[in-house]
């Protein structure tokens, strides 16, 4: 399992640990990742993803997983998240003609 957010593609960064005597040694800054279960209203099921805490805030801000994925850039999403996005778009397209007919 890689240390990369499935929604925002945040990954490890490299920097320096600087001692008191100003000696620099390489270190890695790892993203704050959490295993989170989101509820997809369009799909009608729970979706478990490994995302950064920043992504959790973004999903909340956009009004849920479905709304976030509809707005998200496909290049930043993991293959699993991209499959979810396509499935949600497909469900939304199926539901749209029914809403217009009523």
From Swiss-Prot:
Signal peptide: none annotated. InterPro entries: Ribosomal_bL28, Ribosomal_bL28/bL31-like_sf, Ribosomal_bL28_bact-type, Ribosomal_bL28_sf. GO terms for biological process: translation. The keyword Ribonucleoprotein applies. Transmembrane segments: none annotated. Residues 1-20 are annotated as: Disordered. The keyword Ribosomal protein applies. Coiled coil: none annotated. GO terms for cellular component: cytosolic large ribosomal subunit. GO terms for molecular function: structural constituent of ribosome. Gene3D superfamilies: Ribosomal protein L28/L24 (2.30.170.40). Keywords: Ribonucleoprotein, Ribosomal protein. It holds the Pfam family Ribosomal_L28. Belongs to the bacterial ribosomal protein bL28 family. This is Large ribosomal subunit protein bL28. It comes from Bradyrhizobium sp. (strain ORS 278). The lineage of its organism: Bacteria, Pseudomonadati, Pseudomonadota, Alphaproteobacteria, Hyphomicrobiales.
